[in-house]
Amino acid sequence: MMWSDIDASLPAKKIEVLGPPPTSGTRDAFVELVMEAGAEEIESLAKLAKEDKKAFKAVFGSMREDGAFVEAGENDNLIVQKLEANPDAFGIFGYSFLEENQDKIKGASVNGVQPSFEAIASGEYAVSRSLFVYAKKAHIGVIPGMQEFMDEFVSEKAMGEDGYLPAKGLIPLPAEELSKVRDAVKNGTGVSM
């Protein structure tokens, strides 16, 4: 299938999308943020979503099986290599791999917004998701190291602007939200944003 088969204004080039397997959280996020959101924009599918949520999910959650979508496994380095070999292909993987390989590949803009640290942190780049960490309150003080782990995870050293988690690709919360999370960890309460 060619891009021009979808829209005549698109180039007559073969569609090739390299992505993760069904077991991947990145794929789950892509299905939810891109495929489901896109399906909701199609009138007949929006109607189906209201009438039969299970059927709607079966439609938007299915990847093509005609060769346009290629499961490239969990190895993001392999996807980068394949993108270098075929500059017309698209790859689905986390921002940290784009950032590490920006000399070889470029990110896709979504609604006119390029993927960047700032655009992801602000929520402006639509194809990004938050990372949630859950701890049972009943485990704090019972499971050795649980409170210490939570304290460390939200510490300035770990999650601060110059912390080791952002150095590994994590986009930290904006300061105000991070402060709320730190208070929740300290007080043993939940936080919703």
Predicted features along the sequence, with ranges:
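Flexible loop/hinge segments at secondary-structure junctions
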Residues: M1-M193
